[in-house]
Amino acid sequence: MQNALQKYYDFLRIERRLSPYTLTNYRRQLSAVTELLTQNGIRSWQQVTPSVVRFILAESRKAGLHEKSLALRLSALRQFLAYLVVQEELKVNPATGISAPKQGKYLPKNIDQEQIGKLLDNRSNEPIDIRDRAMLELMYSSGLRLSELHGLDLNHVNLQSREVRVLGKGSKERILPVGHQALDAVLDWLQVRLRFNPKDNALFVSSQGGRLTPRAIQKRMEIWGVKQGLSTHLNPHKLRHSFATHMLEASADLRAVQELLGHSNLATTQIYTHLDFKHLTDVYDQAHPRAKRKG
């Protein structure tokens, strides 16, 4: 079983060019599936039937996995089994037609603009603080995913045109604008970056000189949020959602926000760009000709 998995991981890395972060997620899900199978006496992928797939989902749910995590696990397994069909290791995909439990619409909380200002109001001259502020400014300015920020190299940022080139899901490249404050923060970081003795072209490096890992970026964001007195837990997803919400509040151009976020499906953007009812009411009162009070 492990031999087939390793070939699949090589395929994802070389042929599909998935990021290390995404590849790690695939490994995590398929390792959990493999452990469940071996614990129940299944030693080959040829023994996996639709009933076995349903059993995996049921056991995963018993173990405490929520709907979104179950959907991710099923998706990873289904794609791997489809690969085995193409490789003629299986005749049919036993996960075809099986659905994960229906997910409710999850509306992530956003950070309001006042809190964003508080978050980024730090002019420390410490090199690590300069780096962390540049990461936060860039992520909020361009709505980057954690994996996209992690994968940035020096040549991905064009200082003249104020653009950043990112590799999104499915190796889709997109060019994004960078705001003036984010650009200034990146320039400040580039002036001190060499003090970290960087070992490669990664834009953001650790104190040891290597590319910052996704987990290290998350940890630095958590620490920064606490240090700046943020009233909510800070994570990359929340910052990206805040970017989307604030962009929609300012422009109401859902298609433009979809392009900036790199979503292939507009429905995904609609979930990200949830607007609170008070904002909608304010916009309505100001814009609708029959909503204004008579003077």
Swiss-Prot record:
Its main location: cytoplasm. GO terms for cellular component: cytoplasm. One of its GO terms (biological process) is chromosome segregation. Disulfide bonds: none annotated. GO terms for molecular function: DNA binding; tyrosine-based site-specific recombinase activity. Residues 1-85 form the Core-binding (CB) domain. Belongs to the 'phage' integrase family. XerC subfamily. This is Tyrosine recombinase XerC.
